[in-house]
Amino acid sequence: MSRVAKAPVAIPAGVEVKLNGQEVTVKGSKGELTRVLNSAVVIAQEENNLTFGPKEGVTNAWAQAGTARALVNNMVVGVTEGFTKKLTLKGVGYRAAMKGNAVGLTLGFSHPVEHALPEGIKAECPSQTEIVITGCDKQVVGQVAADIRSYRAPEPYKGKGVRYADENVRTKEAKKK
C-alpha cells in the first residue's frame, strides 16, 4: 500500500488555502488554483498543514487520498515556485519564435505552425531552437509542452523534431544493403 496520503502537505508562508467541502482553493504569489477532490477523501486543515485520509467504507479510499495529496501538493508548489518545461528543436530550418500570445514554429511543413497559449501559461524563446514554458498548473504546463512536441515528435533515424530538453532519443541504424 502506498503511504503518500499519510504525509501532510505543509502550507508555506504567503500561501492561502480555502476548503469548501471537497473544493480546495490555493492562492499564492504566482496565481490561484482550484480543484474539486474525490468524495472518498477527507481533508482537514490543522494550522499550517493539510492532512488527507480515507472516508470509511469506500474501497479505494487510500488510493484516492494519496492522489488528492499529490494534487494539492503540486498546487502549493505551483503557486509558490511554478513549473517549467523546456523544449528543444533539432533539425535543419526548425525554428521557434514568440508571436504575441502564441508560439510560432517552423518545422519543415509547407506552412508555419502557431500554437496559442492557454490562460496562465507563459512561454519564451531564449534562442531559435529553445522554448521554455512556465505556469503554476503542472498539468496544463505539461499538456502545452506535449501539444507542441506532437507537431513534430523526434524521429528515430536522425533525431529531428521537437523534444523535451531532458529527453534522450534513441536513434536507429539505417538499413544496410
Swiss-Prot record:
It comes from the Bacteria. Keywords: Ribonucleoprotein, Ribosomal protein, RNA-binding, rRNA-binding. This protein binds to the 23S rRNA, and is important in its secondary structure. It is located near the subunit interface in the base of the L7/L12 stalk, and near the tRNA binding site of the peptidyltransferase center. Belongs to the universal ribosomal protein uL6 family. This is Large ribosomal subunit protein uL6. GO terms for cellular component: cytosolic large ribosomal subunit. Part of the 50S ribosomal subunit. One of its GO terms (molecular function) is structural constituent of ribosome. PANTHER family: 60S/50S RIBOSOMAL PROTEIN L6/L9, LARGE RIBOSOMAL SUBUNIT PROTEIN UL6M. PROSITE patterns: RIBOSOMAL_L6_1. One of its GO terms (biological process) is cytoplasmic translation.
